[in-house]
Amino acid sequence: MGVKAYLDGILGEDKACKFLKKQGFEILKRNFHSKFGEIDIIAKKDEILHFIEVKFTQNDYEVSERLDRKKLEKILKTIEFYHLKNGISSDFQIDLICIKNDVIQFCENISF
């Protein structure tokens, strides 16, 4: 990943966090890493943990196409690790935030 892509990712996550806070979410953690993968944002709302993948672009391709079954499987393993590491067993869902040309699309409770 180049520097521009890295900085774009941070910018996208910043925008996503701002959006989520306006929607009443509490941001618990950003960029949670495990040997299985990474979760961009971990947030909480109404006692439910939300593990949020952020996809950001300023180009013309569809950002949601960058999340596939393999990436989702890595996210699920990372969520399991997060639960074990923190000694919790709460309800959760996986969400996707797509940001394209400053338009935010929030897809809740995604699956394949």
From Swiss-Prot:
Pfam families: UPF0102 (PF02021). Gene3D superfamilies: 3.40.1350.10. GO terms for molecular function: nucleic acid binding. NCBIfam families: PRK12497.2-4 (NF009152). Belongs to the UPF0102 family. This is UPF0102 protein Cj0148c.
